[in-house]
Amino acid sequence: MKGQVVRIIAGFYDVVDLKNRKLYPLLRGSGLLRLNETSPIVGDFVDFEEKGFIKKIYERKNQLIRPKVANIDQALVFISIREPNFSSLLLDKFLLVIEAKNIPVILLVTKIDLDSNFENLLLDYQKMNYNIFFINNKKNEIPVELKAELEKKLNFVIGQTGVGKTSFINNFLDKKFAIQEISQTLNRGKHTTRVVQIIEKENFRIIDSPGFSSFSYSEISKNEIRNAFKIFKKFSSDCKFRSCFHFQEKTDQCGIKRALKDGKIPENRYKNYLYFLGKYEKKNY
């Protein structure tokens, strides 16, 4: 049978049959997979036996290393306005990894009730044509347009701890996962998600994952960083040299610098790019 891995705990795999959506828990990897040092990850499409082993892992259309997930249709990137405070650097760190894998992005902005100026903080991202939804979890309201965007797709949830991911999932899927209040001393939420898993209800599927501290962009090469952002891909074709890193090159030789000068790329996005490039050079992830 063909299925998809929805959860992994202590070397056991829970798999959903793609045909009838029945859950088959506690499967193991076959001896051949172990011999080849190959292990399934959440999101993998696999061939499996009803009461036994996973026999085959199908080719992945995309994959993240930390957390280990595969075959994502789109990413739901959560960012809060306050508690924790909005940070374009943190948001761009998430987008750097997601867009490097060519995964479509939806930005979900939470805690909008804590700052009346919330829309202005996202102006640069609106200008870059990101798909943005403003969410108030306290009102338990999910925009109809957002539901339509998520239907029949595998949606990967990512964001700093404490931004309201679990509250959103509870509201959206009408499930009750553990929620903890923001830690005032650390200005961040306590981790409420401990395993990567696919949560499913009707035509909606969401990959919930551990919070910010386990999310890494160290898997990205220097070459990937230079054109990871979607808007950089758009203008980098105008660079004179294919190896352009949009840093030391002259403006007339760099499509990114010209777009920056013309106001087509926000200055803050370019500054964040230089920060990530510098972090890579220092090997300080």
Swiss-Prot record:
Cofactor binding note:
Binds 1 zinc ion per subunit.
Domain of life of the source: Bacteria
The entry's Zn(2+)-binding residues are C239, C244, H246, C254
**Cofactor(s) listed:** Zn(2+)
Subcellular compartments: Cytoplasm
Q: Where does GTP bind?
A: T110, K111, I112, D113, G159, Q160, T161, G162, V163, G164, K165, T166, S167
Q: Which GO terms describe its molecular function?
A: GTP binding; GTPase activity; metal ion binding; rRNA binding
Q: Which GO terms describe its cellular component?
A: cytoplasm
InterPro entries tied to this protein: G_CP_dom, NA-bd_OB-fold, P-loop_NTPase, Ribosome_biogen_GTPase_RsgA, RsgA_GTPase_dom, RsgA_N
Per UniProt, the keywords (alphabetical) are: Cytoplasm, GTP-binding, Hydrolase, Metal-binding, Nucleotide-binding, Ribosome biogenesis, RNA-binding, rRNA-binding, Zinc
- Mind listing the GO biological process terms from this record? ribosomal small subunit biogenesis
Question: Any idea where the CP-type G domain is?
Answer: 61-215
So what EC number does this one have? 3.6.1.-
What quaternary structure, including any partners, is listed in this protein's UniProt entry? Monomer. Associates with 30S ribosomal subunit, binds 16S rRNA.
- Family recorded in the similarity comment: Belongs to the TRAFAC class YlqF/YawG GTPase family. RsgA subfamily.
The record's function comment reads: One of several proteins that assist in the late maturation steps of the functional core of the 30S ribosomal subunit. Helps release RbfA from mature subunits. May play a role in the assembly of ribosomal proteins into the subunit. Circularly permuted GTPase that catalyzes slow GTP hydrolysis, GTPase activity is stimulated by the 30S ribosomal subunit.
Q: What is this protein called?
A: Small ribosomal subunit biogenesis GTPase RsgA
Biological source species: Mesomycoplasma hyopneumoniae (strain 232) (Mycoplasma hyopneumoniae)
